[in-house]
Regions:
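Glycine-centered flexibility sites
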Residues: 31, 218, 227-230, 266
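Amphipathic alpha-helical interaction segments
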Residues: 121, 125, 209-212, 257, ...
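Alpha-helical segment that forms one wall of the substrate-binding/catalytic cleft
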Residues: 184-199, 205, 231, 236-292
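Cell-wall glycan-active module
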Residues: 1-195, 290-324
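Amphipathic alpha-helical interaction surfaces
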Residues: 129-132, 136, 199, 213-216, ...
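Short, solvent-exposed loop/turn and secondary-structure capping segments
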Residues: 221-224, 288-289
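Surface-exposed patches in mature extracellular/periplasmic domains of secreted proteins
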Residues: 138-142, 201-209, 222, 267-278, ...
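Solvent-exposed loop/turn segments at secondary-structure junctions
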Residues: 213-218, 228, 238-240, 280-284, ...
């Protein structure tokens, strides 16, 4: 994308139908204060740590805490049905995922390599638990009461965001024709988010949350059924106005264009208005802001979201298209 001055035009409608999050639902993780029905807002950045990865009173089915190197959850690991065991499994998984992300950032190479297996498997299990709770509100309510106090808001935010997006999903019938691929490295994406923030003043966590919801950080590469394209799902007409001569399929260009569009639509002064212009759904706006809020509270939530996988909702149930 050219580094010429931004083309700022009046905000224009942009109904994408979310190739990943709505038509082929790609759903998130995270958490902070407020009730499930609360309107989300972008909180100030702060440093929040997750609960320590101590041993809970019960373990997820199939997991034993004695051998951490060997007890990573399988991709299809059973999810406990009892709220107490479910809360224990979620608490333990969150702590272990935090530690795995710290190890990855300290000893791995998030700027070049893929996420290590512990991060991928723990994140997938956590994502699956949140999806289960989003589809079962009564179970979710009982589970919240069994969680440590410092995890309740985090769980509630994640479940609420996923439920919001599921409410917008249109089940796919027939053959699934969705192109998926591996995302760019986590820290390479983070550099692009921060570059866009510096240029347009739109917080990088909001941009990351939009990309999470739209295409699971670029994993979904198919156009939406209405023709929205690229990692940030732009309609061609909107791209012409805000793309600044860049490539709609290039991640860095698409993030700059998204920041340009959101800035022209009211961000950072009014993120709700700007996001509603990006996609005309209050549920969408709430979900994006909940995810952004979680990343602002703890950057490790960004790395956890980065490893969330793509799900498609079909008339016969849901299918996971990416991951192990």
């Amino acid at each position: 994308m050219n580094d010429q001055p931004a083309v700022i035009s009046p905000p224009m409608p942009r109904r994408t139908m979310l190739a990943a999050a709505l038509a082929a639902v790609v759903v998130p993780l995270s958490g902070c204060g407020g009730s499930a029905g609360e309107a989300a807002s972008v909180a100030p950045r702060e440093s929040v740590t997750l609960p320590a990865s101590g041993r809970p009173s019960a373990s997820p089915e199939g997991l034993t805490p004695e051998s951490p190197a060997q007890d990573l959850p399988a991709p299809d690991e059973a999810i406990p049905k009892d709220p107490k065991r479910l809360a224990d499994a979620l608490t333990r998984t969150a702590g272990r995922l935090r530690d795995a992300i710290d190890d990855w950032r300290r000893t791995g190479d998030p700027a070049k390599g893929e996420a290590p297996e512990p991060v991928v498997l723990l994140s997938l299990y956590e994502q699956r638990v949140y999806r289960h709770l989003a589809r079962n509100p009564a179970v979710a309510s009982r589970t919240y009461g069994k969680l440590p106090k410092d995890m309740v808001a985090r769980a509630r935010d994640n479940v609420t965001a996923i439920r919001d997006l599921l409410s917008l999903a249109h089940p796919v019938s027939g053959p699934i024709k969705i192109k998926v691929e591996s995302p760019e490295p986590a820290d390479a994406l983070l550099a692009d988010f921060r570059r866009a923030e510096r240029r347009f003043g739109v917080e990088w966590e909001v941009l990351a949350a939009v990309m999470l919801v739209e295409t699971k950080f670029g994993r979904v590469r198919s156009p939406s059924y209405v023709g929205a394209r690229g990692p940030m799902q732009f309609m061609p007409g909107t791209w012409k106005a805000y793309g600044m001569g860049g490539d709609i399929d290039d991640t860095g260009d698409a993030l700059l264009a998204a920041a340009n569009y959101l800035h022209a639509s009211g961000a950072p002064g009014d993120y709700r208005r700007a996001l509603y212009a990006y996609n005309h759904s209050q549920a969408y706006v709430d979900a994006v802001l909940l995810h952004a809020r979680q990343m602002k509270r703890d950057i490790r939530n960004y790395y956890a979201y980065y490893t969330w996988q793509v799900y498609v909702i079909t008339t016969k149930g849901e299918r996971r298209l990416t991951g192990p």
